[in-house]
């Protein structure tokens, strides 16, 4: 093989190696990109987008989950008669001191009217929005309370669980960033 042929073979090998490296880098980048939020399906479990359920505020005005886009949202499904829910409220009071978190509590028991719930909210020192919706409980398949959802700024559920400690909340929220 003459010198010119060796140069062409070496040049072809270098071009092929560089092309492969560029392609593999592009492929790796595609696999590590976070998916477009719009492509994430709606659902009620971790990893899905919150369905935009309308719940009724104590003032009678509608509240939508999408009202909280751009903020980390903690959704607390609860009822006034539920002792663990009252304990969860104590944790949520501490959590409400964070400026990067919004909290929305949803009463799931239709037996309680807005007058009672307003008094309950004030007695429990809840400074966030308390709403009432048995339909939302059905939509989100609430089988026990307190049920807690934490959604990121794009409305994607990052945590679903029951009674949640302040330490656990802080860890979840810090992971969301």
Give, region by region, the residue ranges found by the protein language model:
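N-terminal targeting signals for export/organelle localization
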Residues: 1-50, 177
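Conserved redox-active cysteine motifs that mediate thiol-disulfide chemistry
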Residues: 69-70, 77-94
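Hydrophobic beta-strand anchors of alpha/beta hydrolase catalytic cores
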Residues: 74-75, 103, 148
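Structural microenvironment flanking redox-active thiols in thiol-disulfide oxidoreductases
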Residues: 86-124, 132-139
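Thiol/disulfide oxidoreductase modules built on the thioredoxin-like
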Residues: 122-126, 132-176
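A short beta-strand-turn-helix
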Residues: 52-73
């Amino acid at each position: 093989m003459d010198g010119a042929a060796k140069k062409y073979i070496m040049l072809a090998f270098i071009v092929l190696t560089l092309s492969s490296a560029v392609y593999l880098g592009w492929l790796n980048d595609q696999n590590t990109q976070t998916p477009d939020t719009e492509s994430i399906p709606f659902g009620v479990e971790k990893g899905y987008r919150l369905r935009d359920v309308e719940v009724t505020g104590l003032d009678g005005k509608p509240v939508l989950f999408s009202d909280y886009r751009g903020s980390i949202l903690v959704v607390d499904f609860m009822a006034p008669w539920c002792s663990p829910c009252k304990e969860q409220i104590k944790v949520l009071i501490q959590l409400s001191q964070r400026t990067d978190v919004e909290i929305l509590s949803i009463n799931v028991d239709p037996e309680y009217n807005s007058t009672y719930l307003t008094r309950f909210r004030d007695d429990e020192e809840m400074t966030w929005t308390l709403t009432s919706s048995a339909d939302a409980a059905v939509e989100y398949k609430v089988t026990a309370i307190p049920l807690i959802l934490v959604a990121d700024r794009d409305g994607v559920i990052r945590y679903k669980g029951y009674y949640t400690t302040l330490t656990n909340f802080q860890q979840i929220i810090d992971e969301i960033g």
